[in-house]
């Protein structure tokens, strides 16, 4: 059962202004995209890439992009190198470009450390043998060697310490060998000198023994002679 149109309702509809409402339009790129049927087969084709701190357009237009950890770290490093006055007012891209123009940055912190380029490391290893010669290692004390090895690699430091220990032991052995040889030569010279003195003393003893026998024989002849020989006995004594 249909009711007749009310005059008040018709008047309200005629007076209603539809132009004051905005018309919602669908984005054109959404229609020209991949069909709905193909979305199920490629689930990752419609997923946008994750935004980074270097792409401010990916963030909403009403707010500024939030700085990431890497951006904050680079800005802090730049502030330490150039001072806070020069860093203020720089964008992240300008800060990174300025850091790259400054050269390699020494990074020490939770993100890692800068150990130098391979060329610098090779040059350091080449300079170490020139700086630490055998004579320098032997004459250098342990404290001085540890001070010189600061900043050197652990393997290189262990190798130099082992080399110094080997040179020290070799020097001690050579010194002991030289000392023993010197003592041996001294003892041999002393033995030869004492042997010569012994031979001289033996010759002197033999000479004195012969003189003793000669004097004893003369004494026996004088005592066994005639009675007149007693007056001349004192001449031979």
Swiss-Prot record:
An annotated Gene Ontology molecular function: DNA-binding transcription factor activity
Indicate the segments annotated as coiled coil, or none if absent: none
Which PROSITE patterns did the record assign?
BZIP (PS50217)
In residue numbers, the region (Basic motif) covers 159-185
Q: Source organism's superkingdom?
A: Eukaryota
What does the sequence similarity comment in the record state about its family?
Belongs to the bZIP family.
* Domain description: The minimal transactivation domain (MTD) is conserved across the MAF family, it may activate transcription by recruiting TBP and associated factors at the promoters of target genes.
Q: What is this protein called?
A: Neural retina-specific leucine zipper protein
Q: Which organism is it from?
A: Mus musculus
Q: Which gene encodes it?
A: Nrl
């Amino acid at each position: 059962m249909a009711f007749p149109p009310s005059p008040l309702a018709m008047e309200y509809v005629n007076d209603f202004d539809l132009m004051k409402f905005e018309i919602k339009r669908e984005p054109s790129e959404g229609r020209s995209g991949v069909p709905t049927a193909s979305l199920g087969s490629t689930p990752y084709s419609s997923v946008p890439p994750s935004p980074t701190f270097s792409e401010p357009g990916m963030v909403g237009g009403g707010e500024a992009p939030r700085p990431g950890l890497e951006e904050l770290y680079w800005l802090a490093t730049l502030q330490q190198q150039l001072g806070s006055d020069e860093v203020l007012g720089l964008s992240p891209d300008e800060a990174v470009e300025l850091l790259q123009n400054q050269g390699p940055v020494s990074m020490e912190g939770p993100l890692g450390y800068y150990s130098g380029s391979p060329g610098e490391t090779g040059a350091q290893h080449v300079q170490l043998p020139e700086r630490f010669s055998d004579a320098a290692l032997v004459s250098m004390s342990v404290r001085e060697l540890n001070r010189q090895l600061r900043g050197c690699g652990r393997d290189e430091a262990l190798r130099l310490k082992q080399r110094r220990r080997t040179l020290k032991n070799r020097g001690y052995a050579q010194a002991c060998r030289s000392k023993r040889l010197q003592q041996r030569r001294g003892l041999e010279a002393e033995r030869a000198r004492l042997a010569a003195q012994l031979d001289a003393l033996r010759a002197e003893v033999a000479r004195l023994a012969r003189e003793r026998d000669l004097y004893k024989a003369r004494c026996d002849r004088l005592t066994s002679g005639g009675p007149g020989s007693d007056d001349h006995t004192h001449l031979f004594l």
